[in-house]
Amino acid sequence: LGLLPPTQGQVFFDGRDLAACSPRDLRALRRQMQMVFQDTAASLNPRLTVEGILAEPLRVHRLCPRREIPARAAVLLDQVGLPRDLLGRYPHALSGGQRQRVGIARALALSPRLVVCDEPVSALDVSVQAQMLNLLADLQAARGLTYVLVSHDLGVVSHSADRVCVM
């Protein structure tokens, strides 16, 4: 995703070495790769409402006219099982599970092919973890997503992964 440069080796996506891509090509590739972060308190802008958080990638990548953004944000909330009345709220007013769902919705806004999930459920209660894993599985089936799931919890991995790499 380009958040940090690789210290060794190469990172390929769709047959392309990301380190060798031009900034323009990398921007286009980033639309196809998104991230769900572990710490939603740090990854969601506290100065933006949920609608603003979901609108940001749509604006940056110019995916739809500005007047359509509120409707797109509402549909994204529907897809992650959140009520539309959360659009006007700020991240601090949401539960941990709701914030994680907003993070997932933000990742889905660009219709990526690959989503990197960095410990997406480790900060959540066990009951909410199961709901979140089921949501991720449902979204994967509906959208044909590929996940790279980073987790220390082998139970989460066994529930979610088709292939496993232990580091």
Where in the sequence are the language-model features?
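Conserved ABC transporter NBD signature motif
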Residues: 9-17
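Conserved ABC ATPase signature
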Residues: 90-94, 98
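Conserved ABC ATPase "signature" region
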Residues: 17, 68-85
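Conserved signature/switch motifs of ABC ATPase nucleotide-binding domains
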Residues: 31, 92, 110, 134
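ABC ATPase NBD coupling module
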Residues: 5, 18-34, 60, 66-67
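Hydrophobic anchor residue at the start of the ABC signature
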Residues: 104, 132
